[in-house]
Each structure stands twice: as C-alpha cells, then as structure tokens.
Amino acid sequence: MQAQALLHLLQLSSPSLPIGAYSYSQGLEAAIENGTVKDEVGARRWIIDVLHEVVARFEAPVLWRLLQAFETRDAAAVESWTERFIAARDTAEFRAETIQMGYSLGKLCSDLQLGDAEMLALLQAQTEVPLPTALAYAAVTLKVPAEAALLGMLFSWAENQVLVCVKSVPLGQVAGQRLLLSLQAELEVAAQVAQQLPDEELSNWSPGLSLLSMQHEVQYSRLYRS
C-alpha cells in the first residue's frame, strides 16, 4: 500500500473521525448491565462471538460488496446493498446508529469534496445512507485498497468494543490493550470470511443481541446510545 493510501486509511479508522462512533456500544452495554460481560475473559468472549457470528457474516461482507460497487460505479449494486443493510437493522437503536453515523460520514465526504460529481451522485441517490455505504464511498474516493478498508473497519469496530469494556466493565488500560492485541488474528480471519462468503450465506441472525438492544432502549442508566 502506498503511503498516501495508508494515511487515508488511518484517518478513516481514527477515533477522531467525527461520526460519533464512541457513543454506541451495539448492545455491549446491556450485556455488561445484565452481568453477561463482567471481566476481561468475558469481554474477549463476547467480542469474538459477535465478530464471527454477526460482523464477519453480514456487516463486513456488505461493506466488501459496497467497496466493489463504488469502485465499478455500479449504481444498482450500491442501492441494493444499501437497502439490504438498512433492512437488516432489526432494532430502533441499531438502525438509528448506522443512519446517524452514515449521514455524518457522508456529509463529511461532501464537505471535503471527496470524489467527482458522478461518484457523489451515487452516494446522494440513496434515500438513507448507512455507515457501510458512506465508508465504502470514502475509501474508494481516497483510493484505499478494498482489503485494507475492510480490515480497517473491523479494527475500528473491535477498538470501539474494547473501549466500551474499559469504561463500563470496567477494565484497566493495560487490560484493554492486551485485549485488543489478542483480537488481531480473529480480525484477519473475519476479513477473509467477509471476502469469501457467497451472497446466499450472508446472515445477521443474532436474536440474543437483538433482545439486548431492545432492553437497552429502556435501560435505566446508560452511557451509550445503543
């Protein structure tokens, strides 16, 4: 990867990217609240389970397909995978999360004038823009290789999950970094699965996670919006 592409990838993966990722836990806060996650071992188990059962089998594969669609400027594919991703957000919090973050990143891309008029039209043609669509657009217009963009997305997701555990379990800073290091091989496997999974095998079937998300909507005390 060229240095410029690497720098763009680091910017897209940075916690300082102004899309509000830090304000969401994707159900993890509810799992901490009910005692499912209460220490470093439980945190690692939770993150790995969600990574392989949900993220690697749906969110990452959809991002991979959107990266290809924007690269080839395939308007029909962009629309189809965007709509499919939104339809798969099965709770109010999960849907609001991806739409808010996608809108913020899409607006940032527009404000920074990333991409030509044809590319921008592909993005703006979507009724709603979830995060994977905006992220794919940003990566393609910044010429970040698809494989790197996919791994960057997975790392950002894992880092955010670890930060939730550090704040809410709570875990120490060293434990958080140890946990993040221990996830590297798992992230590589998830990236490979996302690239190889056929369309008919994509699935976000995770009823337990969905129930936790719904419980989180009425959780009395919380730090996160999901």
From Swiss-Prot:
The keyword Cell inner membrane does not apply. Required for maturation of urease via the functional incorporation of the urease nickel metallocenter. This is Urease accessory protein UreF. Pfam families: UreF. PANTHER family: UREASE ACCESSORY PROTEIN F. Signal peptide: none annotated. Its main location: cytoplasm. Keywords: Chaperone, Cytoplasm, Nickel insertion. It comes from the Bacteria. Belongs to the UreF family. It comes from Janthinobacterium sp. (strain Marseille) (Minibacterium massiliensis). HAMAP family: UreF. UreD, UreF and UreG form a complex that acts as a GTP-hydrolysis-dependent molecular chaperone, activating the urease apoprotein by helping to assemble the nickel containing metallocenter of UreC. The UreE protein probably delivers the nickel. InterPro entries: UreF (IPR002639), UreF_sf (IPR038277). GO terms for molecular function: nickel cation binding. The lineage of its organism: Bacteria, Pseudomonadati, Pseudomonadota, Betaproteobacteria, Burkholderiales. It is found in: Cytoplasm. One of its GO terms (cellular component) is cytoplasm. The gene is ureF.
